[in-house]
């Protein structure tokens, strides 16, 4: 028997062993999967409108090469979110711990399509020469200076991925309210339970179990149309010292509109320039064309996303002075 054949046979034996160790129902799920979420837990503890701690544990078994992406770790951070703790463990098909993964091994990337942003990413690419193998990650994220939304419960992250069990728990102090919305959960083994803690806390718990893999089909529905998830959002919130209410679209729109207050003022020299450009125009269309042509020559799109700047536009005065702004900054400037 050749070395290649022995290696291939060993891989098949390991896969069979892995399946034999799984419960019957889990075997059914795994048989059509490239990766299997063995256990995923998320706990969100909100301490106030501006602070929270998110603790996550994810154990996933990679059944073949096509499921390898599920073995990697990613954590997005910014000036509001920071990774506090992390640990990982790689386990082979026999259930033996191969190695521990430390936080110092994570790669930090600040790569972005924006000119400047406070977003950054921690990631770890997990690779192992034989399948199946299991990887377990445990991490904690601290949120400060604002909470405009909470993590989404999404038990399945990719096509051909089964789920043995997944859970999500969020707790808010008395007086705060969290709303939720389910999507694509009908007919699936996903439950949402709401309760009140001993000190008046609002507690929401979501559980999912034995979710079969979703198979990608040519010209089939998109990821967003198929995958189950539960969204969570506060009613009243505070974000970068700006308080708002998103219990209704009307109230959230009023908060968004308040971010524009005082940011659409133009300098007197620029106002004079606009009058000069449109002085000889006889129709509104000619005026619009004159202003548009001038702004097209004197402004450029540049993405700068810092803090609440991801939602609040740069002032019209600064766009006039520098000649650049992002989409909302230029739109605000062009309201003239």
Regions found by a protein language model. Give the residues of each.
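Lumenal/extracellular ectodomains and adaptor appendage modules
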Residues: 27-167, 268
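Cysteine-centered nucleophilic/redox motifs
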Residues: 58, 135, 168, 291, ...
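Conserved short loop/turn motifs at secondary-structure junctions
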Residues: 73-78, 153-157, 277, 310-324
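Conserved structured core elements
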Residues: 52, 129, 162, 264-268, ...
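Second-shell loop/turn segments in exported
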Residues: 120-125, 260, 274-281, 316-325
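Generic beta-strand/beta-sheet core signal
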Residues: 91-93, 209, 330
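Secretory-pathway-linked proteins and extracytosolic
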Residues: 142-152, 158-160, 167-308
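Bacterial Sec-dependent N-terminal signal peptides
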Residues: 1-28
């Amino acid at each position: 028997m050749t070395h290649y054949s022995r290696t291939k046979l060993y891989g098949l034996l390991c896969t069979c062993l892995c399946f034999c160790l799984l419960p019957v129902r889990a075997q059914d799920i795994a048989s059509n999967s490239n990766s299997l979420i063995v256990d995923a837990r998320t706990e969100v503890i909100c301490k106030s409108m501006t602070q929270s701690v998110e603790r996550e544990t994810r154990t996933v078994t990679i059944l073949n090469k096509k499921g390898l992406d599920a073995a990697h770790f990613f954590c997005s951070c910014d000036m509001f979110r920071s990774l506090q703790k992390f640990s990982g463990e790689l386990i082979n098909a026999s259930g033996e711990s191969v190695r521990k993964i430390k936080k110092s091994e994570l790669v930090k990337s600040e790569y972005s399509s924006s000119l400047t942003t406070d977003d950054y990413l921690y990631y770890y690419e997990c690779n192992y020469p034989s399948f199946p193998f299991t990887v377990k990650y445990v991490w904690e994220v601290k949120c400060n200076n604002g909470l405009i939304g909470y993590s989404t419960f999404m038990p399945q992250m990719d096509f051909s991925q089964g789920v043995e069990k997944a859970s999500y728990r969020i707790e808010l102090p008395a007086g705060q309210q969290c709303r939720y919305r389910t999507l694509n959960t009908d007919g699936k083994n996903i439950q949402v339970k709401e309760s009140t803690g001993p000190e008046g806390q609002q507690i929401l718990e979501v559980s999912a179990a034995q979710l079969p893999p979703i198979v990608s089909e040519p010209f089939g529905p998109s990821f967003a149309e198929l995958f189950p998830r539960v969204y969570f959002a506060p009613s009243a919130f505070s974000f970068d010292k700006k308080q708002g209410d998103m219990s209704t679209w009307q109230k959230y729109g009023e908060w968004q509109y308040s971010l524009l207050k005082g940011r659409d003022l133009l300098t007197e020299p620029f106002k004079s320039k606009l009058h000069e450009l449109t002085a000889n125009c006889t129709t509104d269309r000619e005026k619009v064309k004159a202003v548009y042509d001038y702004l097209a020559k004197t402004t450029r799109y540049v993405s700068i996303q810092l803090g609440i700047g991801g939602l609040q536009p740069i002032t019209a005065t600064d766009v006039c002075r520098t000649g650049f702004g992002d989409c909302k900054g230029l739109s605000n400037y062009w309201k003239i």
